[in-house]
A protein has these predicted regions:
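N-terminal glycine-rich anion-binding loop in soluble enzyme alpha/beta folds
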Residues: 13-70
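Short glycine/serine/threonine-rich phosphate/pyrophosphate-binding segments
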Residues: 13-17, 81-94, 98-112, 119, ...
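Short, glycine-rich nucleotide/cofactor-binding loops
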Residues: 4-15, 76, 146-156, 278-285
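Glycine-rich phosphate-binding loop
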Residues: 90-109, 184, 188, 193-256
Length: 313
């Protein structure tokens, strides 16, 4: 198995990317190989700094980089030898089993939609992220940014995608799916959330427990939290800020430490034909390492095949 990394993606690339890749290669030894994609002239000297064993990592050379500020679609189309474009081609051809990048988020979404494409039957892929539960374990929230406006049918599908990830990757036998809303009652919320509630309620593929509120986010009420990308992104950034506040105030707490984005490393794009993960632009070596390990976990669990089978029916 091969897990690929865009070595040129992120604010601290390629240094942080290479360091994270070396850490991941050590932790995945005997399970999967880490493949670096990017400027070989920059990557090789950095690998050498990490010792002889690091120099054995495979490097796929590229000559272009999609910068953070570039227009995603235009850059992806014009820079076909960029680390992101090449990464997606390797993923689509089956040469690697997962592709991770802390680079341009928009370009990662463009590549997901136009190179590997959505699973037949999926209206719109979603970006997911993770919610540490107070009593231990992890929940999943989606969408967190790919789709600011959603149709009820899209929210229903997010419930299915999240439930499959929770079951097959997180190991939750019967994931509880909750719809983020402004009240628990069935008739609460916008026209979209009310309609989505009715669809989720009768969906045979999920265990829907009804509406949940913001205060339920971190408890065990729901394992899968469904929302549109606008709401999900606000929730995600707010949760990340809680960790930042704790750190600035010098407060150490095991639970709040789990809100640190580094612990999971990245956000999977669910509903596409291959495994792709988007990392934080400020990703550290630890975050890069955990993103690659998450890529391995997704590939090992066969989550894409599970999604394809579900949406085939």
């Amino acid at each position: 198995m091969k897990i690929a990394l865009d070595a040129m993606g992120g604010d601290f690339a390629p240094q942080a990317a290479v360091a994270g890749a070396v850490l991941a290669a050590q932790r995945l030894a005997g399970k999967a190989q880490v493949v670096l994609i990017g400027s070989e002239a920059e990557i090789r000297p950095l690998l050498l700094e990490h010792g002889p064993s690091a120099t054995t990592l495979e490097v796929v050379p590229t000559t272009q980089v999609i910068e953070m500020g570039e227009h995603p679609t235009k850059a992806f189309q014009q820079k076909q030898d960029s680390s992101i474009a090449v990464g997606y081609r390797l993923l689509h051809s089956g040469e690697v089993d997962a592709f991770c990048s802390a680079g341009n988020t928009g370009a990662m979404l463009v590549g997901a939609m136009f190179t590997v494409k959505a699973v037949p039957g999926v209206m719109r892929p979603a970006i997911a992220n993770f919610v540490p539960k107070v009593n231990g374990g992890m929940g999943i929230i989606l969408d967190v940014g790919a789709n600011a406006d959603c149709k009820p049918e899209m929210l229903e599908q997010f419930g299915e995608l999240g439930s499959l990830y929770a079951q097959y990757v997180l190991g939750i036998a019967r994931p509880k799916v909750g719809l983020m809303n402004l009240g628990e009652e069935e008739g609460k919320g916008s026209v979209v959330t009310q309609a989505a509630h009715q669809l989720l309620k009768v969906n045979p593929h999920i265990h829907f427990i009804g509406n949940i509120e913001g205060r339920d986010l971190f408890d065990d009420k729901a394992d899968v939290i469904v929302c549109d990308g606008f709401t999900g992104n606000v929730i995600l950034k707010m949760a990340e800020s809680m960790y930042d506040i704790m750190e600035k105030r010098g407060l150490n707490d095991e639970y709040f430490a789990r809100l640190n984005y580094e612990t999971v490393g990245g956000s999977p794009i669910l509903g596409i034909n291959d495994n792709a993960i988007i990392g934080h632009g400020v990703s550290t070596p630890r975050a890069i390492c955990n993103m690659l390990i998450q890529g391995y976990q997704m590939a090992h669990a066969g989550i894409v095949d599970q999604i394809k089978d579900t949406f085939k029916s």
